[in-house]
Regions:
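Short alpha-helical segments enriched in small residues
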Residues: 1-118
Length: 118
């Protein structure tokens, strides 16, 4: 993440979350990156309240990069905040992937495709 961005905005913000996810894609030469930044607690940090979290997902496909970011305000213990942020990041990434799938591909799914894993 660009040091100037962090100096200007701090580490807990949407731009940093997207930069982290994009950095993961670039560093790992992948197609999908997920990042979280925030304060899980206990207590606030650097003026940011406990539970304030940003989750981001970045996907590259065919030379196009798509990103999404969400701000969350979560309650609970450190473990609860971290777990909720993780779930939110995965859901955001899932949403990006679903949006990239052609509608005809989604229509051809069978009920077995939708069944939860045991």
């Amino acid at each position: 993440v660009n040091a100037d961005l962090v100096a200007r905005q701090g580490v807990v913000n949407a731009e940093v979350a997207v930069a982290m996810a994009l950095g993961a894609v670039e560093l790992l030469e992948g197609d999908l990156g997920i990042a979280t930044t925030g304060v899980a607690g206990p207590g606030p940090s650097e003026g940011v309240d406990q539970g304030r979290v940003f989750v981001a997902a970045v996907m590259t496909q065919g030379g196009t990069t798509t990103s999404a970011v969400r701000e969350l305000v979560l309650g609970g213990t450190r473990a609860v905040v971290r777990a909720a942020a993780t779930r939110a990041g995965l859901a955001l990434a899932h949403s990006l992937v679903e949006q990239s799938v052609e509608p005809s591909s989604r229509l051809n799914r069978t009920s077995a495709d939708e069944a939860p894993l045991a």
